[in-house]
Each structure stands twice: as C-alpha cells, then as structure tokens.
Amino acid sequence: MSQEIAVVGSPEFTTGFRLAGVRKFETVPDENKDEQLDEAVRSALGDDDVGIIVMHNDDLEHLSRTVREDVETSIEPTLVTLGGGAGAGGLRDQIKRAIGIDLMEEDES
C-alpha cells in the first residue's frame, strides 16, 4: 500500500505543495495556529493513508506539548520539518529518529 504526503501549515506554506500535486493538506491561517494547529496535526497523524507529514519548523512552537511529543516520536507517519534554519543536521536527526540508524554516519576507518 502506498502512502501519501500530508502538509500542515499556513496557506502560504501549503500552496506550493498543493500546486506540486500533494492532495492531503491541513491549512491553518497564522492568526489561528495556537487554536487550530493541534487538531490539524492530530488529523494528519490519524490518517492511515499518510506516511510523511511536512510542516514548517517554526510551527512546532505553536503545538501543545502533548501533540508535539506525539508528532516527534511518531514512526509512521514521519514528521519532516522545513525552514527555520534546521539545515542538514535537522534532517539527519529526523531520519535517524524515524528509522533508528544514522544513514549519514561517516566511516572512521
């Protein structure tokens, strides 16, 4: 069974993904993030068709502690955050957390 990408965030953040063909998205206006972002993320987490959730790194600050812990420890779907200066190190940590090994580990021999 193939799984889909879901994007959660502001209209500005989700629009590009929608134009690229992502069909699952939860749009939350910036002014409503504190009230609505938790529910949008829970919806994506609970969707069996979703394998990856994409969010802007800065949006993690708007999540309640419980939802943030749920999404950060979720194996499937896996959270990928973009922006906010996370860089390659942030992606490396996300991959390591998701699959349990460091694919980018340098061989010390």
Curated annotation (Swiss-Prot):
Q: Where in the cell is it found?
A: Cell membrane
Q: Which GO terms describe its molecular function?
A: ATP binding; proton-transporting ATP synthase activity, rotational mechanism; proton-transporting ATPase activity, rotational mechanism
**Gene Ontology terms: cellular component:** plasma membrane
> Which controlled-vocabulary keywords does the entry list?
ATP synthesis, Cell membrane, Hydrogen ion transport, Ion transport, Membrane, Transport
Per the UniProt record, one Pfam family is ATP-synt_F
Q: Which segments cross the bilayer? A: none
Please report the record's description of how this protein sits within the membrane.
Answer: Peripheral membrane protein
Is Nuclease tagged as a keyword? Answer: no
Q: Which GO terms describe its biological process?
A: proton motive force-driven plasma membrane ATP synthesis
The function of this protein is: Component of the A-type ATP synthase that produces ATP from ADP in the presence of a proton gradient across the membrane.
Family membership, please give it.
Belongs to the V-ATPase F subunit family.
How does this chain assemble?
Has multiple subunits with at least A(3), B(3), C, D, E, F, H, I and proteolipid K(x).
Name-wise, this protein is A-type ATP synthase subunit F
Species for this entry: Haloquadratum walsbyi (strain DSM 16790 / HBSQ001)
